[in-house]
């Protein structure tokens, strides 16, 4: 039987962790769409990796209270790979697709990247906040669908220079590029003791020569995804899939 899964952040848990109050949106979906009632069984995940089997205790007009029966294993286990995927801002629904598929593929964090050739510009902090809120909602819906108990965290849009400088000894930085790149195996061998991976994918226009030079300067590894020209959203999905296959839980 398919689990009826709902999201509740830790703030929604009572101090003793025995009861959970669902948000208005989650409660409305349970009550009005799924037609659930008192004593029905549901599952709740907290976005941090924990999942609980619960029973509906009370139904209000704008909320729903659940009694926690037990902590249970998540519907799907998390990948052992701590993967940050940074993708140049893309037009329209392309970035929405990246958010959805990155969540399904077990990406830990998603960074909207501001690059020279990015398809979209951020007008002001309010515009950035609206976009991040939208993308985080997409990540939440995708997590519900694919069975993850941990949410992919969508960061605020970040300048490429800032991300390039953020690399440390425990990070393996991989810049996927259509030119001047090597193999993913060579990238792994360049820093055998890495703990996490930060992978970057550019826009349709690719990276500028200056961006490639800066990446090398900060010891990022340049990697190609084969000889075919991929759309940016396809490249992002392929990059995440490749890294999860080699280092995570795919295959």
Where are these regions (language model features)?
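N-terminal positively charged helical leader segments and presequences
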Residues: 1-74
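Glycine/charged-rich beta-loop-alpha catalytic/anionic-binding loops adjacent to active sites
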Residues: 20-22, 80-84, 195-198, 217-225
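Generic structural signal for residues in well-ordered beta-strands
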Residues: 66, 151-155, 222
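Short, acidic/turn-prone active-site loops that include or flank metal/cofactor-
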Residues: 72, 204-205, 227-230
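RNA substrate-binding interface of SAM-dependent RNA methyltransferases
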Residues: 73-175
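Active-site/ligand-binding-proximal alpha/beta "capping" segment
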Residues: 170-206, 211, 220-223
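Structured adenosyl-cofactor binding patch, chiefly the S-adenosyl-L-methionine
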Residues: 209-251
């Amino acid at each position: 039987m398919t689990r009826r899964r709902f999201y509740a952040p830790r703030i929604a848990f009572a101090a003793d962790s025995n009861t959970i109050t669902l948000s208005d949106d989650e409660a409305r979906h349970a009550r009005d769409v799924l037609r659930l009632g008192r004593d029905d069984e549901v599952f709740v995940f907290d976005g941090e990796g924990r999942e609980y089997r619960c029973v509906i205790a009370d139904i209000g007009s704008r909320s729903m209270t659940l009694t926690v029966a037990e902590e249970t294993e998540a519907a799907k286990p998390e990948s052992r790979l701590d993967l940050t995927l940074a993708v140049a801002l893309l037009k329209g629904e392309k970035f929405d697709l990246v958010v959805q598929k990155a969540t399904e593929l077990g990406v830990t964090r998603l960074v909207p990247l501001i690059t020279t050739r990015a398809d979209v510009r951020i007008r002001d902090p309010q515009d950035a906040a609206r976009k991040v809120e939208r993308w985080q909602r997409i990540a939440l819906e995708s997590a519900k669908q694919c069975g993850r108990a941990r949410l992919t965290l969508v960061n605020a849009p970040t300048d490429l220079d800032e991300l390039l400088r953020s690399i440390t000894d425990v990070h393996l930085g991989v810049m996927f590029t259509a030119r001047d790149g090597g193999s993913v195996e060579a990238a792994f061998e360049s820093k055998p003791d890495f703990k996490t991976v930060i992978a970057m994918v550019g826009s349709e226009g690719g990276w500028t020569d200056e961006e490639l030079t800066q990446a090398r300067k900060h010891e990022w590894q340049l990697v190609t995804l084969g000889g075919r020209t991929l759309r940016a959203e396809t490249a992002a999905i392929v990059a995440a899939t490749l890294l999860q296959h080699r280092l995570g839980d795919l295959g």
